[in-house]
Amino acid sequence: MSTITKDQILEGVAALSVMEIVELISAMEEKFGVSAAAVAAGPAAAVEAAEEQTEFDVVLASFGENKVAVIKAVRGATGLGLKEAKDLVESAPAVLKEGVNKDEAETLKKSLEEAGASVEIK
C-alpha cells in the first residue's frame, strides 16, 4: 500500500467541485462520527451573559402620527423647553436620556409610546 501525502490530498480536494466537497465532508462526518459545525465558545460566553446591564439609553426612534403629544411627553420627561423638545423630537432617531435605570427607562418608554412615539431602550 502506498502512502498518500498531505499535499496530494490537498491537490485532490482543490480539483473537486463545491458539490463534491460537500459530499466529501458528509462522508467524513459519517465515517469518523464527527460534525463539521462550528463549536460555540463555552465559559467566556457564560460570563458575559451573567453581567446584567444596569444603565440604559432611551432612544426616540420616531414620533409617529401625533407629534404634538410626543413633544409634550418629551418635555415632561426631560424638562426641556418647548423649542428644545420640538427640535429633539424632529431630529429622531435621538437619545432622550442616557444612563438611566431599567425602571425609569421602561416608564419613559411607556409614556412616550402612549403619546404615539416609537421608542427603543438600548
Swiss-Prot record:
It holds the Pfam family Ribosomal_L12_N. GO terms for molecular function: mRNA binding; structural constituent of ribosome. GO terms for biological process: translation. Belongs to the bacterial ribosomal protein bL12 family. This is Large ribosomal subunit protein bL12. The keyword Nucleotide-binding does not apply. Homodimer. Part of the ribosomal stalk of the 50S ribosomal subunit. Forms a multimeric L10(L12)X complex, where L10 forms an elongated spine to which 2 to 4 L12 dimers bind in a sequential fashion. Binds GTP-bound translation factors. InterPro entries: Ribosomal_bL12, Ribosomal_bL12_C, Ribosomal_bL12_C/ClpS-like, Ribosomal_bL12_oligo, Ribosomal_bL12_oligo_N_sf. Forms part of the ribosomal stalk which helps the ribosome interact with GTP-bound translation factors. Is thus essential for accurate translation. Keywords: Ribonucleoprotein, Ribosomal protein. One of its GO terms (cellular component) is cytosolic large ribosomal subunit.
